[in-house]
């Protein structure tokens, strides 16, 4: 069963306009899932990860409803059929 990435509007130019991307076969960690996403859409990588391979501070990634910052980061387990959401931070003011 594939996993599904939900792609935010700002990154869809790198996925051919796709709002969702399915990865199959299912990877076992977030790092593996992201590597599979980057193989399909290499332009996404620099927007999500630093040169050291870490998730950028202004990017939140959720596996289901859990923010990976609190579940093990790139080592977070990924189950078959799960949905992964990439959510850039939004800020504003007056």
Briefly describe each language-model feature range.
Residues 1-94:
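Ubiquitin-like/PB1-type beta-grasp interaction modules and other compact soluble beta-rich domains
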């Amino acid at each position: 069963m594939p996993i599904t990435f939900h792609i935010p509007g700002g990154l869809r130019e790198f996925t051919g306009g796709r709002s969702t991307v399915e990865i199959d076969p299912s990877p076992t960690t977030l790092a593996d899932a992201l590597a599979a996403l980057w193989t399909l859409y290499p332009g996404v990588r620099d927007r999500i990860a630093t040169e050291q391979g870490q998730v950028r501070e202004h990017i939140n990634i959720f596996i289901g409803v859990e923010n990976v910052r609190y579940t093990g980061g790139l080592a977070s387990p990924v189950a078959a059929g799960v949905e992964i959401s990439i959510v850039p931070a939004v800020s504003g003011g007056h």
